[in-house]
Amino acid sequence: MTRSKVDPKADPIDELADLISPFEQRGMDLSLERMQRALADLASPCADVPAVQVVGTNGKGSIACMIHSGLTAAGLRSGLTTSPHLTSWCERICVNQQQIELAQLRQRLKQLQPLAQLHNLTPFEQLI
C-alpha cells in the first residue's frame, strides 16, 4: 500500500482537527438512523456498490487488506476503509492500494461538513 506524504513537522493528530470534531462518548446516539438519513441526503451513493464487510474479533485488518490486495491485483477497482489509524487520518482510506492524500481528504470532508453537522456524524461516520 502506498502511503501519502505527511509533513513530519505537522502534528498528525491535529491535521484535520478543524473538520473532524473530537469523539464524545457520553450521550451519543449510536443507532444507524443518523447515518441512514445522511446517506439518503446524498441520494444513497453506496446502494449499487458491491461490498465485502469483514467482521469478527481478531484479524479483520489483515483479512480486509488481503481482500483489497487481491481485488486490486485482479484489475478491479477496490477501496478499503480501516480504523483506527496510527499517525494520520489518511491511513483509513485506500483505493487501489493508494492511500488518500491529505489535501483530497480535507477537500471531501469540507464538502461534507454541513451534512456531518446536520446529522451529528461521529468521526468514524464522516470517514466512511
Task: Go through each PLM region and give its residues.
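A conserved segment at the C-terminal end of the G1
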Residues: P50-V54, S62-L80
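Positively charged, low-complexity intrinsically disordered leader regions
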Residues: M1-P50
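Short active-site-adjacent helix-start/loop capping segments
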Residues: K60-A64, T87-C90
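ATP-dependent carboxylate-amine ligase catalytic core
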Residues: D7-P8, L32, Q36-A47, A73-I128
